[in-house]
Amino acid sequence: MIFVQQFEEVRLILEKAKKITVLTGAGASTESGIPDFRSANGLYADANVEMYLSRGYYNRSPKEFWKHYKEIFQINTFHQYKPNRGHRFLAELEEQGKDITILTQNIDGLHQLGDSKHVIDLHGTLQTAHCPKCKTGYDLQYMIDHEVPRCQKCNFILNPDVVLYGDTLPQYQNAIKRLYETDVLIVMGTSLKVQPVASFPQIAKREVGATTILVNEELTGQEYNFDYVFQNKIGEFVEGLSSIK
């Protein structure tokens, strides 16, 4: 009964909210089959991965960088992944006229493929790369088709649009600005272990006074920063919310 009541309350909150902000992490994409790179058995468990994905390594050895980049993110098979029920749910909220912005730590681009229009890619995206000289952009298929992708105009080795270790977060200020405007913050599928994103729930609740909602299979240690906590997969949460009439 309490669980049903929580769903009812959250549904009403979303109906009344003027501005909804959603923070998503790996759990938003694992239901599409994408591995959680930060899990115990994930690719980030390799001690060398941070070095291979660093700005310094790209600058020193761009050809070797691209070899490891493609292996780590398995980009040759990335087309197989499709948006799941959670991605579609957020796009549907937007289609209903809600002012919704997604702040995602994911680099897979599935929110955009799922038709969400207002997405801030905090850690960049695997879907594109660009020429460091002329800034011409290239898509995922171009990266797949070329062992070491180069600009067709300048012949420079492309720069991936993923935020590398050693980079700043170019979208951080835009994310903070949105947090201070929001009525509701929904955190979905993230363990909230990586700063500065881990501070977002506290900012939303303590400084902004927004209603905060957590949807994550495992506890994060930040439950005190949330008004509602759903220890579920995102798909389960969406189905529970959809069942409330």
From Swiss-Prot:
A GO term from the CC aspect: cytoplasm
Gene3D superfamilies xref list: SIR2/SIRT2 'Small Domain, TPP-binding domain
Signal peptide: none
Residues annotated for NAD(+) binding in this entry: 26, 30, 37-38, 105, 107-108, 123, 190-191, 216, 234
Keywords: Cytoplasm, Metal-binding, NAD, Transferase, Zinc
Cofactor note: Binds 1 zinc ion per subunit.
Chief location bin: cytoplasm
E.C. no: 2.3.1.286
Role according to the record: NAD-dependent protein deacetylase which modulates the activities of several enzymes which are inactive in their acetylated form.
Family under the similarity heading: Belongs to the sirtuin family. Class U subfamily.
PANTHER family membership: NAD-DEPENDENT PROTEIN DEACYLASE, NAD-DEPENDENT PROTEIN DEACYLASE SIRTUIN-5, MITOCHONDRIAL-RELATED
Protein name: NAD-dependent protein deacetylase
